[in-house]
Amino acid sequence: MEWELNLLLYLALFFFLLFLLFLLLFVVIKQLKNSVANTAGALQPGRLSVHREPWGFSREQAV
């Protein structure tokens, strides 16, 4: 009786972790697709993309 309960718990834990793994994989793939789409959109020749440095000054001012 006890080993059946252990088997049930291990199976439940296994499927729960498998579900979390697939969920994480789905989120990562979705983020990668968004990142690739944003990069492709920013590199189109018709669009002007303003590149701002995170520390507040541009490369031209640094020289």
Curated annotation (Swiss-Prot):
GO terms for biological process: mesendoderm development. The chain crosses the membrane at residues 9-29. GO terms for molecular function: transmembrane transporter binding. GO terms for cellular component: plasma membrane. InterPro entries: SMIM43. It comes from the Eukaryota. Keywords: Cell membrane, Membrane, Transmembrane, Transmembrane helix. Residues 7-29, 51-57 are annotated as: Important for interaction with SLC2A1 and SLC2A3. It is found in: Cell membrane. It is a single-pass membrane protein. Required for mesendoderm differentiation. Interacts with glucose transporters and promotes glucose uptake. Probably augments the glucose uptake capacity of glucose transporter proteins to meet the energy needs of mesendoderm differentiation. Interacts with glucose transporters SLC2A1/GLUT1 and SLC2A3/GLUT3; the interactions may promote SLC2A1- and SLC2A3-mediated glucose transport to meet the energy needs of mesendoderm differentiation. This is Small integral membrane protein 43.
